[in-house]
C-alpha cells in the first residue's frame, strides 16, 4: 500500500478542497478513506484493502474494550503482536499474548479488550464478501454507539 501526502505552500490551503474534489471525481479512495481512525477504545490503521481481504492494525488502550459484536458478511483472524488481549468468543473468554491468534467465524459474537496497563496491538485480517464498518452489529457497547 502506498502512503500519499498532500503538501501545499503556506497560504495556499484554499486549493486543498479543489484537489480533494478532483480525486473524488476520479474515484480515488484516498479522497474519502483515512489510514488512521480513532475510536473511544483506541485506534486502527488500514494496512490493506482489497477485494479478497482487509487488514487492520488495532491498538486498544489500557483498560478499554471494543463492543461485543458480530458480522453478517465477514470472518476475522486476530494476531496479537504486542501486549495481552482479552477475547470473548461466544460464551468463552481467552487471554492471548503476543504471537498468539484466534479465528472469529462469520456470525460469531466476539469482543476484544485490554485489561492491562499497556497497549494491546492486534493485526486483524478480515475475509468475506464485504468489509464496510456498517457490517458491525453491536450486541453491547461500553461507549453506547
Language-model regions, residue ranges each:
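Active-site loops and adjacent core secondary-structure elements that bind or stabilize anionic groups
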Residues: 1
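Left-handed beta-helix
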Residues: 4-79, 84-102, 110, 131, ...
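Double-stranded beta-helix
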Residues: 32, 111-145
Amino acid at each position: 500500500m502506498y502512503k500519499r501526502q498532500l503538501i501545499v505552500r503556506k497560504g495556499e490551503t484554499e486549493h486543498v478542497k479543489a484537489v480533494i474534489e478532483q480525486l473524488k471525481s476520479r474515484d480515488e479512495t484516498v479522497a474519502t478513506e483515512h489510514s488512521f481512525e480513532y475510536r473511544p477504545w483506541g485506534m486502527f490503521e488500514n494496512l490493506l484493502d482489497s477485494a479478497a481481504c482487509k487488514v487492520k492494525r488495532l491498538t486498544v488502550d489500557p483498560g478499554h474494550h471494543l463492543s461485543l459484536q458480530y458480522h453478517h458478511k465477514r470472518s476475522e483472524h486476530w494476531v496479537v503482536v504486542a501486549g495481552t488481549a482479552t477475547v470473548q468468543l461466544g460464551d468463552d473468554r481467552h487471554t492471548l499474548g503476543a504471537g498468539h491468534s484466534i479465528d472469529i467465524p462469520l456470525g460469531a459474537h466476539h469482543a476484544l479488550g485490554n485489561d492491562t496497563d499497556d497497549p494491546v496491538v492486534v493485526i486483524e485480517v478480515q475475509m468475506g464478501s464485504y468489509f464496510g464498518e456498517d457490517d458491525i452489529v453491536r450486541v453491547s457497547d461500553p461507549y453506547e454507539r
